[in-house]
């Protein structure tokens, strides 16, 4: 499963707090955190988080999850993630899903992981879309549904997630959740390989051995079109 992504949080922070009357205090914490002064960030954000400031809650969760300026405390991270997630912050929902998925700071619970992944995935978080695809693919915390797995893999793949691109290739190769299609399998393996996913190039070449030259050319053309359109024209 995917881990927690700090860069996403820092980029979104100011947008969420621009209209807050406490934005100045939040900004002090943000500047401190960006310079590595998490002690000051904690001092600025904790009162805001206690008052319900959602991004202060989210960033506190990150600090406790990663041990930035505080003793690492997964249970405390879960507490703050949950508060932010319940206010609809997609990144918090996704990260809370990871905590439940891995049993980190909370009892492991596949159904809860699915619940939070779904909420985040529906808001467009690529890692949550991928993770939800995995849950459907494996029948973990939800009834196994290959077509639903393909749906979520596809959404994550179209955001550039190489693991999802590879997994769609495998689904097309096996005809799992989709009609079997070596051209599409080759296409997605090729895209995943171009994005650095280990073994995708090997699997692409293995399936190419079963294809005609015309089909290989078609798959390569589809891959180029998909990537050049920033995954908007992937067939």
What are these regions (language model features)?
Residues 19, 36-37, 50-53, 66-68, ...:
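Short helix-capping/linker turns of helical repeat alpha-solenoids
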């Amino acid at each position: 499963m995917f881990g927690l992504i700090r860069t996403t949080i820092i980029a979104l922070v100011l947008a969420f707090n621009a209209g807050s009357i406490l934005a100045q205090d939040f900004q002090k914490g943000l500047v401190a955190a960006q310079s590595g002064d998490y002690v000051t960030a904690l001092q600025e954000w904790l009162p805001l988080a206690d008052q319900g400031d959602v991004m202060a809650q989210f960033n506190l969760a990150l600090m406790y999850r990663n041990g930035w300026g505080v003793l690492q405390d997964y249970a405390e991270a879960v507490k703050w993630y949950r508060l932010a997630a319940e206010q609809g912050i997609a990144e918090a929902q996704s990260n809370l899903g990871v905590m439940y998925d891995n049993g980190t700071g909370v009892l492991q619970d596949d159904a809860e992981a699915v619940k939070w992944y779904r909420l985040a995935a529906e808001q467009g978080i690529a890692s949550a879309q991928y993770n939800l695809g995995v849950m459907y693919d494996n029948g973990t915390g939800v009834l196994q549904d290959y077509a639903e797995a393909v749906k979520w893999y596809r959404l994550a793949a179209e955001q550039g997630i190489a693991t999802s691109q590879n997994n769609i290739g495998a689904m097309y190769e096996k005809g799992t959740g989709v009609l079997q299609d070596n051209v599409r399998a080759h296409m997605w393996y090729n895209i995943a390989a171009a994005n650095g996913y280990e073994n995708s190039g090997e699997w692409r070449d293995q399936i190419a051995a079963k294809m005609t030259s015309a089909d290989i050319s078609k798959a390569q053309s589809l891959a180029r079109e998909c990537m050049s359109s920033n995954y908007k024209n992937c067939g």
